[in-house]
Amino acid sequence: MKIRLTDIEYPFVTAGTVFTFTGEHPFDKEPVDFMLCEYHSGKADRCEFAFYCVSGYHSGSLEYVLPIEAKAQGTVVAVSTQWLKEHWKSHVYGGCKACDVTLTNWIWDQNEKYKSNTKE
């Protein structure tokens, strides 16, 4: 099952989530997969997450280390969904908008629990 990044109501995503989009140069014009991975850069202005390309010719390449502002609030070790929605094109990958990104390998049951707990 896939879901668009912009359709996610859950406040964060965790390591192992795969983000799929249609690539442009330097990627092939076919689906590109970025996986959110833990990455401890040791720099104060970076959080402990990065995107690695996990498809095609660039598979295994480190693509982007996320800034500290991307970290989800609270004690959870995750990335803010809102930050990704707002900064996908400007920070993560400039070749597409957040509405063109789909997620797979995401924690669906937590999303359903979150939805049911936030309804009045």
Write out the residue ranges for each language-model feature:
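Intrinsically disordered, low-complexity, charged/polar segments
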Residues: S55-E120
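Generic secondary-structure microfeatures
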Residues: T22-H25, H40, W83-L84
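Mixed-charge, Lys/Arg-rich low-complexity intrinsically disordered regions
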Residues: M1-V13
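Intrinsic-disorder/low-complexity loop/linker signature
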Residues: D7, F27-K29
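Short coil-to-beta transition motif at edge beta-strands of beta-rich domains
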Residues: P11-E24
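Basic/aromatic-rich interaction segments and small domains that mediate binding to polyanionic partners
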Residues: K29-I68
